[in-house]
């Protein structure tokens, strides 16, 4: 089986990286692909929480401390996604050896079409390992300057590790009238924005229920955006009923212009 390992990363936290990892995994599974989602941020259990698997034992912690076989720590979710979760245990984290991760991933990667690794945010030793494992890097950013600056640094680190940029997910678009535009972001990162994911309250509601947004509201704007992303990555055409709606907040200047047009 030909497989692809995709590390999903962001230069800073809070941009929706884990949401993107879970949603892309579910979307690829809906397209008939066999997908393994790995909770690569071993100090947290965010991906495991979204799949409601943070209490599973053994977990990646036990695998990285050589207390369990990796195949015993992989669980099939109801969406069809296979998940290698991390636990909430601080002791488990302390016992884990991140240097074992490449061998762990390579042991099972050829059982799947796609391996999605939800990497920790920022630039650190763990991130270096995740970049070295990956065939491709998928960056998640929000349309804000600090998010973009951190993403540029992360992309440069990936290039040094020999990991090419697959593209950029521009997340939470339409939240603020002061946000940067797509063209400006592509110019700064020197990478293509594959999809714009609109600000969507369904994402937060889904997370509270420990679900991906695609499970929660399959026709929501964010769900459609993630299905589009999976379609681009897998090369499988899909039909989206409506154009993805991105409602941008009206700036003060736009409001003044609109008022003048009324007279």
Swiss-Prot record:
Keywords: ATP-binding, Nucleotide-binding
InterPro entries in the cross-refs: AAA_dom, MinD_archaea, MinD_FleN, P-loop_NTPase, ParA/MinD_ATPase
ATP-binding as UniProt keyword: yes
GO molecular function annotation: ATP binding; ATP hydrolysis activity
Organism lineage: Archaea, Methanobacteriati, Methanobacteriota, Methanomada group, Methanococci
Family listed: Belongs to the ParA family. MinD subfamily.
Source species: Methanocaldococcus jannaschii (strain ATCC 43067 / DSM 2661 / JAL-1 / JCM 10045 / NBRC 100440)
Cysteine disulfide partners in this protein: none
Name of the featured protein: Uncharacterized ATP-binding protein MJ0169
Binding site for ATP: 12-19
Stored Pfam families: AAA_31 (PF13614)
GO CC entries: cytoplasmic side of plasma membrane; cytosol
